[in-house]
Amino acid sequence: MGNTKYTKEQIRERIQQKKILFDGAFGTYYGGKYDTRQLPELANLEAPERVKEIHREYLEAGAQILRTNTFAANSFCMDIPREQIGETLRRGLRLAREAVAEWRETTGETKEIYIAADIGQIPGEAMAQKDALSREYEEICNIFLEEGADFFVFETFSEMEELLPAIKMIGEQAFITVQFSVNQFGYSNAGLSARKLLQRAGEAKEIDAVGFNCGVGPSHMHRILQILEKPEGKLLTALPNAGYPQMVTGRMLFTGDNKDYFVDRMQQMTALGVDMAGGCCGTTPEYISDLAGKLDFTQYPQTQEKAEPEKKRA
């Protein structure tokens, strides 16, 4: 049951009928839960039960899309042999499947659960190596496709030029989501506006869903979505951070409890046409549980209220 393979069209039809809930953060939650600064992707090989435990917590919270623990599993971010990076990717997908199967066996649940092969933007100086990045993303996607992945999430991207070869390679083989990260003013680290990012993603026929994750908290993401138009023919995603981190004893931590505020803003975002909601850095299974209990997941024709951009104060 945990290894059900879905077609691209099956996933699209399901989400068009009823809004759906992603999981929350993996990296920040893993670091806090196990009090470690170790790259969480290493746990796929070194501590697989920890990985499955977090996946199960999100399933119990009500998530129907699990992202694999592979966000930074690439040769630029991980200082391990390339063959181990490949195994990290494979294990990431397998562990999520095992977690779903174990959860089904324990609970008797039969609802559809989608496992998204998670690929994050490769940061830093590597971003200047466009050809090398494109090859890396293609290699990562090939490994996931060999493992039978039917759902991809490219997230926290500031642009998508280097992604296009991989996206075109996947084509009709899997459901494709691309999520961008912008700041509170609606611009990515590449200097592109949220509007331009959605426009470019909207022009790629292979992409099924577009949206935003990370970068900002729920209030700023809501304000950004208010002044944007949903790309025609695309599903819309929103996965903000819990808020903004603070430096505590040398670590960037998300402090305080703002779950109620987070859920309230997410309710407003789904009313704007968001089809796929969830959380990024700082969110936990508790956030997702509250979302599952309070969001209206019915799907209906969307009419977006447009807010005027805020005027700059003198």
Could you describe each region identified by the protein language model?
Residues 1-314:
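Domain-level signal for soluble alpha/beta catalytic cores
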